[in-house]
């Protein structure tokens, strides 16, 4: 029962992060265009995410080894959330590129942490089912975040 609760919490945390990330990815492009950002700047904002994602994938395993899954996930989720909120305060293309890269770093880290954590708590018989549910939850949440733009 304890492992089911752990997995449920991981799914919920991942879903919330991916919802926010899905909304952020689409909303920044729309808002940047409304603010008059150049097409180059809008492209670099999207590229910043990818650069941050690669950097996070390479760096976060070291963080997990030092502080553990729970603390590392908490830090990635907190910083990822803060970067999204800072986009509201700093409305210029350079800061959005940097914030988007930091956001990509945190989202890659959070995904890596959740996936390694799920790998640890799943046995060989349930691992495929666990990961298929995880991927379904995160893709649904990301899509729902993108669709939420109609509400904003």
Predicted segments with their positions:
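Helix-loop boundary and gating motifs at the non-cytosolic
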Residues: 3-50
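Intracellular juxtamembrane helix-capping segments at the cytosolic ends
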Residues: 28, 109-122
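Loop-to-transmembrane helix entry/capping segments in MFS-fold secondary transporters
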Residues: 39-40, 124-134
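Residue-level signature of mid-helix packing/kink "hotspots" within the transmembrane helices
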Residues: 50-54, 58, 142-143
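Helix-to-loop junctions at the C-terminal end of transmembrane segments
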Residues: 56-68, 149
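Helix-breaking motifs and short loop linkers at transmembrane-helix boundaries and internal kinks
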Residues: 68, 89-91
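Structural signature of the two symmetry-related core transmembrane helices
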Residues: 71-86
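Paired small-residue
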Residues: 94-102
């Amino acid at each position: 029962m304890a492992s089911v609760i752990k997995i449920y919490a991981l799914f919920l945390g991942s879903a919330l992060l991916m919802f926010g990330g899905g909304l952020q990815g689409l909303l920044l492009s729309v808002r940047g265009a409304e603010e008059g950002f150049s097409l180059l700047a809008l492209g670099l904002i999207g590229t910043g995410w990818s650069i941050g994602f690669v950097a996070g994938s390479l760096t976060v395993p070291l963080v997990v080894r030092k502080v553990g899954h729970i603390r590392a996930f908490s830090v990635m989720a907190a910083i990822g959330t803060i970067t999204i909120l800072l986009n509201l305060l700093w409305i210029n293309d350079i800061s959005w590129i940097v914030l988007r890269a930091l956001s990509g770093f945190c989202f890659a880290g959070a995904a890596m942490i959740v996936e390694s954590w799920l790998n640890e708590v799943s046995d060989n018989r349930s691992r495929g089912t666990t990961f298929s549910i995880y991927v379904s939850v995160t893709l649904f949440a990301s899509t729902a975040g993108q669709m939420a733009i109609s509400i904003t």
